[in-house]
């Protein structure tokens, strides 16, 4: 397991950000504790719009799972959870510890994502997360699974 760095940029994967933002999530307490440690270390937390997209989907899934199955309407959409989604996004965009990033070089970033699929057998979304890190020269990621452990240039702070 990678030690938590100090004064570094750390890319946040959805597997960490969603539990941090969503109290009903089973890993909420664990995420809160790790976030405190990241901030105590004066780290800058980086994410992409892709992470926010994935987080919105997790919010819908978790909130939907909290409902009584008898009251569950078929076809519920993201709008039914808009207050939870808005609260999560506002938490990120209003906090100066977070930085939402895009590619510095979009063409190179997209090409690198394809290379990451080929080189590391990643799913496209994970390949893009790694590509954002490469584009921004970010060495650390907080991810809830071990897929990033196999990547030599990426230091996974396990969650």
Enumerate the predicted regions with their spans:
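Histidine- and aromatic-rich ligand-binding microenvironments
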Residues: 12-13, 47, 122-124, 145-146, ...
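Active-site-proximal, substrate-binding regions of enzyme catalytic domains
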Residues: 18, 32, 50-52, 56-115
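Active-site neighborhoods of divalent-metal-dependent phosphate/nucleic-acid chemistry enzymes
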Residues: 5, 94-140
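Acidic, PIN/NYN-like endoribonuclease modules and their adjacent C-terminal/linker elements
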Residues: 1-5, 9, 130-159
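Short, surface-exposed, polar/charged, turn-prone segments marking secondary-structure boundaries
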Residues: 38-40, 73-75, 128-131, 151
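Conserved beta-strand segments of alpha/beta enzyme cores
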Residues: 44, 97-99, 155
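Short, well-structured N-terminal submotif of metal-dependent ribonuclease cores
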Residues: 1-51, 58-74, 136
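Secondary-structure boundary motif
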Residues: 37-40, 61, 94, 119, ...
């Amino acid at each position: 397991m990678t030690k938590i760095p100090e004064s570094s940029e750390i890319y946040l994967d959805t597997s960490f950000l969603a539990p941090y933002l969503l109290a009903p999530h089973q890993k909420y307490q664990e995420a809160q504790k790790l976030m405190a440690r990241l901030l105590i270390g004066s780290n800058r937390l980086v994410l992409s719009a892709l992470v926010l997209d994935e987080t919105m989907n997790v919010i819908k899934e978790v909130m939907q799972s909290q409902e009584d199955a008898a009251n569950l309407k078929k076809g519920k959409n993201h709008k039914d959870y808009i207050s939870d989604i808005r609260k999560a996004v506002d938490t990120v965009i209003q906090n100066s510890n977070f930085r939402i990033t895009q590619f510095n070089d979009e063409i190179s970033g997209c090409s690198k994502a394809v290379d990451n699929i080929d080189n590391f057998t990643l799913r496209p979304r994970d390949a893009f997360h790694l590509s954002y890190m490469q584009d921004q020269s970010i060495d650390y990621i907080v991810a809830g699974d071990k897929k990033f452990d196999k990547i030599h240039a990426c230091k996974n702070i396990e969650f």
